[in-house]
Amino acid sequence: MLIAWPDRVHCCEIMLQEGARVVDAVEMAALNGIEQAVGYAVFGVLVTSDHVLNDGDRVELLRPLLIDPKEARRRRAVSA
């Protein structure tokens, strides 16, 4: 389980039953900041909360974007 916010990063390993879903992993991890997650990914691929996990999967909690990536690039290009 991986959660990476601007002010902190937390990674933990949890053991689940075979057939466990993303939502089961999230509940089991009980990390601070989970309520801010707007989505989930497994190894960088978007998944739903009912996605069945495989042994060794890395579940990532996704945070909301603060700014549109295209707009951020435009701003950096202007200031460079």
UniProtKB/Swiss-Prot annotation:
SUPFAM superfamilies for the chain: MoaD/ThiS (SSF54285)
Pfam families xref list: Ub-RnfH
Cystine connections: none
Transmembrane segments: none
Family: Belongs to the UPF0125 (RnfH) family.
Name of the protein in its database record: UPF0125 protein PD_1376
Lineage of source species: Bacteria, Pseudomonadati, Pseudomonadota, Gammaproteobacteria, Lysobacterales
